[in-house]
Amino acid sequence: MPVKIPDNLPAAEILSAENIFVMSETRAAHQDIRPMKVLILNLMPNKIETETQLLRLLGNTPLQVDVDLLRIHDKESRHTSLDHMNTFYRDFEDVRHKNYDGLIITGAPLGQLDFEEVTYWDHIREIIDWSQSHVTSVLFLCWAAHAGLYHLYGLKRELLKTKRSGVFVHSRSCDHHPLLRGFDEEFFAPHSRYAEIPVAQIHAHPALQVLAESDEAGAYLVLSRNSRNLFVIGHPEYQKSTLSDEYHRDLAAGINPEIPQNYFRNDDPAQPPVARWHSHGSLLVSNWLNYYVYQLTPYDLSDMSAITPWEASSKS
């Protein structure tokens, strides 16, 4: 939680420079403690597994979070019963009139298709467009990150020769950024995808900022300059066994996949995997909720015009 201090206290500038989260009395007066309302658009086939992964991360923060689950259509999912979907998920028509503090859009196993070939691409575009006026901050994961960067900023991805699967080391691309508070200079994150957007294209876009990247895996954390959209080109939510499950699933399907890099002990699939990203994943989601949802969102969600970018709010 933030440290509330008097307006114009000299310590404010010093603490901000040291990456300490402070909030002026003036800004605090416009906020009150209430649950953060977060919508999750779950595009993964195994809905329950993905729900659990994301709720685990959201539950590691000191903030109270109310979650709504959103589906892209009312058809039965391959790995999740229609009863589960009808009981726990909402359709877009149920929420389009609402505003939310945060939206998380998950990845999807669609990495080798052009976006326009995805049967529900028009629905994805509609929800992304809606989010820009109805949600304080949107977190896009993996495939959704590529989809968002394409739809909002026109950045095109390129197919890789082989699937990029494994746990890769990343480094911060900038210092003293709120989203990176508490991050080590180098940290690990899982990747599982068939495409990438060249990092040079993202760096060159004036509306985007690359916060973390990998020599092997490319851009990882990309933030829009208005602080409203965070693109996480990876899977910080993955549990320890997820890459192993994907690898053995592909083996069983006769795909002959590459062994996930830096994942199994001694790179041997017969040995257990080593999870090196859980603390980073928790910190990433905690920082997003704290600094880009709680810090920016209006108390009255009906007035989304009260949102101000972090750079402006941190000077208040």
UniProtKB/Swiss-Prot annotation:
GO biological process: L-methionine biosynthetic process from homoserine via O-succinyl-L-homoserine and cystathionine
Catalysed reaction equations from the record: L-homoserine + succinyl-CoA = O-succinyl-L-homoserine + CoA
Disulfide bonds: none
Alphabetic keyword roster: Acyltransferase, Amino-acid biosynthesis, Cytoplasm, Methionine biosynthesis, Transferase
Record bears the keyword Chaperone: no
Cellular compartment(s): Cytoplasm
A Pfam family: HTS
GO molecular function: homoserine O-acetyltransferase activity; homoserine O-succinyltransferase activity
Uppermost EC category: transferase
EC code: 2.3.1.46
Keyword Oxidoreductase: no
Binding residues annotated for substrate, in chain numbering: 163, 192, 249
Cited function: Transfers a succinyl group from succinyl-CoA to L-homoserine, forming succinyl-L-homoserine.
Protein name: Homoserine O-succinyltransferase
